[in-house]
């Protein structure tokens, strides 16, 4: 029958298209150097988020940052707006503390509550389009955001007051202007890469001869620290920010050794805790603080992690660390040594350089990653553009190895030097 249709001119072209579709096999070549130079130039100006997108899927990166395709903007209060409001409000609050006569250890509770409200108003005004908040649904969401911000400020202050680390910098912007080795990379004789970004918070603790640095990144989503994701290039931000903060701190404290203390995500939330109604207010507060514990990895030196939570017994409610009765670390503690921090740092730097070179070499493969039940397609808005379908020949996921043992991951990082 196909031969009959092909032999008739009025049907031949349609049949040809049908046969092409039926036996389609996806193939793809990298884009040429002339194209990459036109898109990116010889100096890549990158955010870390952009490189994480490249690690998830090179084609998605190409569409977003090369061709600069954008989703249609709608006049609505979206999750990204909530995240921006949280960040801006926390920045305004921190500036008020820094410019006042108080510290994070002495700020009165009534003033704390007042400044939260004012900082929230400042953040909303900074959004520009305040009309969107007049809608009933958005007014309700805004009240929830305010309640969450109040809980967040309470928790952040409680965490600070449990230790010796002091918030020293907020919304630290770094770029090529800072001439930091941590964010400037040579890809070839003619090509360079410069990273830009903003560190939400840098805390420091100063001993007699050392300064310890802790990074905190505020997240309104459910982002969890993963050493494996660092290994696969999917979660580079905290390590890059730590490298930049260590270099900036070293320039500030020229006579002291600067060491990494920890890298953390703080999940902005307003959790509910289980109980039977007999708990005291203090027990409830401790349970909430436990829910809002920093998520990340801590330096295993006792002097360092104890400076983040001075007098905890058993498990800390501030950091992911617990001690046995003899004072040794529990197996569940999320810790690494100073040397292992350097291992992560060196590995991430090599990964960044390799990614930059791949981008300039024209890598645009439609090969999203897959690891367990997660893929590079999960939150990608470009599926209708790439038409990725693993059932079609030539389309396939890039399978990433699942490694559970931290020591194995760190050994791999050392070996791939």
Tell what function each PLM region has.
Residues 1-417:
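Structural signature of nuclease core domains in nucleic-acid processing machines
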């Amino acid at each position: 029958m196909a031969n009959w249709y092909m032999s008739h001119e009025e049907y031949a072209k349609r049949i040809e298209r049908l046969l092409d579709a039926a036996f389609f096999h996806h193939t793809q070549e990298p884009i040429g150097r002339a194209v990459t130079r036109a898109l990116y130039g010889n100096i890549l100006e990158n955010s870390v988020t952009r490189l994480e997108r490249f690690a998830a899927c090179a084609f998605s990166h190409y569409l977003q940052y090369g061709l600069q395709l954008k989703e249609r903007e709608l006049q609505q209060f979206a999750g990204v707006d909530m995240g921006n409001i949280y960040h801006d409000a926390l920045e305004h609050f921190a500036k008020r503390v820094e410019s006042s006569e108080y510290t994070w250890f002495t700020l009165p509770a009534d003033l704390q509550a007042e400044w939260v409200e004012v900082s929230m108003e400042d953040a909303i005004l900074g959004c520009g389009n305040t009309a969107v908040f007049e809608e009933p649904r958005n007014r309700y969401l805004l009240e929830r955001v305010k309640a969450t911000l109040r809980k967040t400020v309470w928790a952040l202050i409680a965490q600070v007051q449990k230790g010796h680390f002091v918030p020293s910098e907020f919304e630290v912007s770094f770029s090529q202007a800072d001439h930091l080795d941590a964010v400037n990379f040579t890809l070839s004789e003619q090509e360079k890469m410069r990273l830009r970004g903003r560190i939400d918070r840098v805390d420091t603790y100063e001993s007699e001869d050392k300064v310890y640095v802790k990074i905190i990144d505020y997240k309104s989503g459910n982002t969890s620290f993963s050493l494996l994701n660092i290994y696969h290039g999917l979660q580079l931000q905290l390590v890059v920010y730590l490298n930049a903060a260590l270099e900036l701190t070293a320039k500030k404290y020229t006579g002291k050794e600067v060491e990494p203390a920890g890298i953390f995500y703080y999940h902005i939330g307003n959790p509910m805790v289980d109980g039977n109604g007999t708990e005291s207010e203090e027990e409830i507060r401790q349970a909430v603080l436990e829910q809002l514990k920093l998520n990340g990895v801590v330096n295993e030196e006792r002097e360092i992690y104890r400076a983040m939570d001075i007098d905890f017994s058993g498990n800390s409610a501030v950091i992911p660390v617990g001690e046995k009765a003899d004072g040794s670390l529990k197996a569940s503690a999320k810790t690494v040594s100073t040397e292992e921090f350097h291992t992560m740092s060196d590995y991430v730097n090599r990964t960044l350089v390799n990614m930059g070179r791949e981008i300039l070499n024209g890598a645009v493969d439609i090969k999203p990653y897959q690891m367990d039940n997660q893929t590079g397609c999960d939150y990608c808005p470009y599926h209708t553009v790439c038409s990725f379908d693993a059932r079609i020949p030539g389309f396939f996921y890039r399978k990433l190895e699942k490694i559970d043992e931290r020591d194995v991951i760190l050994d791999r990082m050392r070996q791939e030097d």
